[in-house]
Every structure is written in C-alpha cells, then in structure tokens.
Amino acid sequence: MAENNFPIYAECGGLMYLTKSIDYGSKKFKMLGVFDVTTKMQKRLKLNYTKAIVSHDCLISNATNTIHGHEFHFSELDDVPRDSKFAYDLSIGVGIKNKKDGLMQNNALASYMHVHFGRSTFAKKFVQNCIKNSRR
C-alpha cells in the first residue's frame, strides 16, 4: 500500500511494524519494510513530553505548525539512511534521530511521537488526505 501512495499513519509500535525488522537480543523478527531501517530493542525507557515544528508538509499538517505529544518506548531505530526525510524537528523530546521524528516515504508518516490530537486540525487533515486518496 505504501508504494501505491495510500496514506499510512503510525506512531511508536506502528513505526516499529513499518521497519525492516525488530531485533530483540539474539532474535530478529521480520516486519513490513516500508522504511529501510531496523528497530533495536533497548533496556532503557525513553519517556518524554514532545514538542515539534512540522518541517515538511505531511499527512496530518502543513509545515510550520507546532505539534505536542509524548514518546514512550524501549526501542531505537538503527541504520537510518542519511537521506531520510523527517516531518518534525523536536525542541522537546528525542525522536528518531538527532531530534528529528516523523519518517516520511511516499504517503507514509511514522514517528515515535504520540501526537496530542485534542486541540488541533491534525485528525481532520489526515481524514481529508484519506478521502482524497480513496477517489483515485
């Protein structure tokens, strides 16, 4: 579906599912491979509130908007390609790599950040993108 440009939105566990694999100690579990990265489980919890500026137009927002949320995970992504496109620049939180979060490829968006949808138009924008793509 990702290669056909259908909208895919994923947070945290969904992000992990869209990677090539999840490595857990000596075990490796194959995932979907939408993103050319590997998830590696860690012993240490990453728990933060998050605040980000949207750096690129994406499925849920136009660029320059501010997004709030949180992250809560025991994993990190390994071998993130240098040319990866990220939707968010974090001022608070860790994200995927170098305070960047929201991996983008085709019409897929996946992040460690759990976005707070309560007082925003992000859900509406996502639904509009889904409707637009359902009419193709």
Regions found by a protein language model. Give the residues of each.
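Amide-donor transfer/coupling interface in amidating biosynthetic enzymes
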Residues: M41-R136
